[in-house]
C-alpha cells in the first residue's frame, strides 16, 4: 500500500529520516555520480519518461477519497517539472524516441525528460494543462476512448471506491456477500487493504471477470459511477481536442482499459485498433503513441501495437531507457505526491534522489519491474499449492 501523508508521528519520523538520507546523499554528490554512470550505460544521454495520472488542487482531500498513488497536487507538479527542467531539456515523446534511436555514444549537452499522463482524467485538461503551458513543457496524454465523454469511470476507480466503502463499514472482502462467482474471484485476490486487493485483481483477472467483480461490488455498497469522487471523471471529446490544440499529444490507451496480455489476440487487436480509429476520427489524425494499461505487455502485444501503426509505446517499468532499445517498450518512472514530499512539504533533496534514480541505484528503493515479469510471477503464485505463503510483493499502487 502507498504511504499516505497522514501527518501521524510515525509518518513524520519516516519522512524526516528519508529526507535526511536524501540530503546527505545529495550533499555528497551521489546524484552526479549516478548520473554519470547511468548516462554511460544509456549510450550517452539519459532519457527519463515520467508518468502521472490525476492532478488535483487539494492532494489531501483527494487522497482521502481515492487512490493516493495516482495523485499529484498542482503545486507539486509544477515544482517537480521546474526541478527536472533545471538539469534536463523538456521534450516531446517523439523527440525522446528520436534521441534513443541515435547511435550509442552520441553526446548531448543535457539529458532529457518527457511528461506523460495516463487514463485521461479530466483534470489533465482543467489543472495540468495551464501548468504545462506556463512551463513550455511538451506532454502526452493517453486516453481510454470508450470512456471519453461518458459518465462511466475506470474499473480501478470503481473497485477501489467500493472496497474502501466496505472497509469503512468494517466488512472484510471475504465477507462482502457478493454473488457466488464474483465472491470467489474476490476471495482469491483479497489482501490487506483496498489498494493491495485491487492490484491482485488487476494482475489476475481478464477484463470480463474484473468488470464482474466491479459491478458486484458497486451493487453491494450502492455506488453508481456518478457517485464516485468528482476527480475520477474522465475527459470529454471537447477537452481532448483542447489538449491537442494546447500542444499536448494524445495517445492511445485502449478502448476499455483492458489488460492486454489477459485477452485473446483478436480481442486485444480490437482494443488497440478501436482506440486508434476513434482518435483518428475525432482528432483528424491517427495517434503515434500508445500506453499499455497498467503497463502490462508481452512480445505478442508489442507486435500488435507495431502492426497497428504505433511508433512508440510506454510501460511502467522503472529502469533506464537505453539507446538501441525497443521504442515499443519505453520505461517510465511513476511519479506522484509522495515522490517528493517531506514532513514539511516539498523536498528538493528527496526529489533529486527519487527522480534521478539515486535511491534505486543504491538499492534503497525497489523499482517497479517490467510487467511481463510481474505477470510471470503472478502465474507462478497462482500455481502455488494451497496453504503455502507467498513471498513479499510490492504493491503497484506504491509505484514511484
Protein language model features and the residues they cover:
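Extended, charge-rich helix/loop segments that form flexible
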Residues: 40-47, 51, 151-246, 370-383
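Short, flexible active-site-adjacent loop segments at beta-strand->alpha-helix junctions, enriched
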Residues: 53-56, 145-147, 254
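Residues within well-ordered alpha-helices
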Residues: 80, 128, 236-239, 301
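CE4/NodB-like, metal-dependent polysaccharide N-deacetylase domain
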Residues: 108-109, 121, 129-142, 184, ...
Amino acid at each position: 500500500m502507498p504511504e499516505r501523508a497522514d501527518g501521524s508521528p510515525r509518518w513524520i519520523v519516516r519522512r524526516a529520516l528519508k529526507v535526511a538520507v536524501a540530503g546527505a546523499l545529495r550533499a555528497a554528490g551521489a546524484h552526479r555520480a549516478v548520473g554519470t554512470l547511468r548516462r554511460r550505460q544509456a549510450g550517452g544521454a539519459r532519457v527519463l519518461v515520467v508518468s502521472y495520472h490525476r492532478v488535483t488542487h487539494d492532494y489531501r482531500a483527494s487522497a482521502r477519497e481515492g487512490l493516493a498513488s495516482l495523485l499529484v497536487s498542482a503545486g507539486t507538479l509544477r515544482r517537480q517539472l521546474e526541478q527536472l527542467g533545471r538539469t534536463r531539456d523538456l521534450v516531446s515523446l517523439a523527440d525522446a524516441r528520436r534521441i534513443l534511436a541515435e547511435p550509442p555514444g552520441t553526446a548531448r549537452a543535457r539529458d532529457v525528460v518527457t511528461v506523460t499522463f495516463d487514463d485521461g482524467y479530466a483534470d489533465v485538461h482543467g489543472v495540468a494543462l495551464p501548468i504545462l503551458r506556463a512551463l513550455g513543457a511538451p506532454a502526452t496524454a493517453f486516453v481510454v476512448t470508450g470512456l471519453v465523454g461518458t459518465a462511466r469511470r475506470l474499473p480501478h476507480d470503481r473497485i477501489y471506491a467500493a472496497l474502501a466503502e466496505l472497509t469503512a463499514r468494517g466488512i472484510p472482502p471475504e465477507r462482502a456477500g457478493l454473488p457466488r462467482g464474483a465472491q470467489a474471484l474476490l476471495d482469491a485476490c483479497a489482501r490487506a487493504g483496498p489498494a493491495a486487493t485491487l492490484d491482485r485483481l488487476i494482475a489476475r483477472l481478464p477484463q470480463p471477470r474484473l468488470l464482474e467483480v466491479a459491478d458486484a461490488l458497486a451493487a453491494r455498497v450502492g455506488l453508481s459511477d456518478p457517485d464516485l469522487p468528482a476527480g475520477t471523471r474522465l475527459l470529454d471529446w471537447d477537452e481532448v481536442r483542447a489538449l491537442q490544440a494546447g500542444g499536448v499529444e494524445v495517445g492511445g490507451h485502449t478502448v476499455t482499459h483492458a489488460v492486454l496480455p489477459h485477452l485473446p489476440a483478436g480481442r486485444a487487436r480490437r482494443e488497440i485498433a478501436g482506440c486508434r480509429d476513434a482518435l483518428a476520427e475525432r482528432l483528424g489524425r491517427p495517434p503515434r503513441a500508445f500506453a499499455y494499461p497498467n503497463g502490462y505487455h508481452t512480445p505478442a502485444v508489442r507486435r500488435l501495437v507495431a502492426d497497428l501503426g504505433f511508433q512508440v509505446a510506454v510501460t511502467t517499468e522503472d529502469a533506464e531507457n537505453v539507446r538501441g532499445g525497443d521504442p515499443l517498450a519505453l520505461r517510465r518512472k511513476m511519479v506522484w505526491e509522495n515522490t517528493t514530499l517531506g514532513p514539511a512539504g516539498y523536498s528538493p533533496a528527496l526529489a533529486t534522489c527519487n527522480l534521478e534514480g539515486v535511491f534505486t541505484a543504491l538499492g534503497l528503493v525497489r523499482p517497479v519491474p517490467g510487467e511481463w515479469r510481474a505477470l510471470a510471477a503472478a502465474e507462478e503464485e497462482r500455481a502455488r499449492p494451497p496453504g503455502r505463503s507467498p513471498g513479499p510483493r510490492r504493491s503497484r499502487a506504491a509505484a514511484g
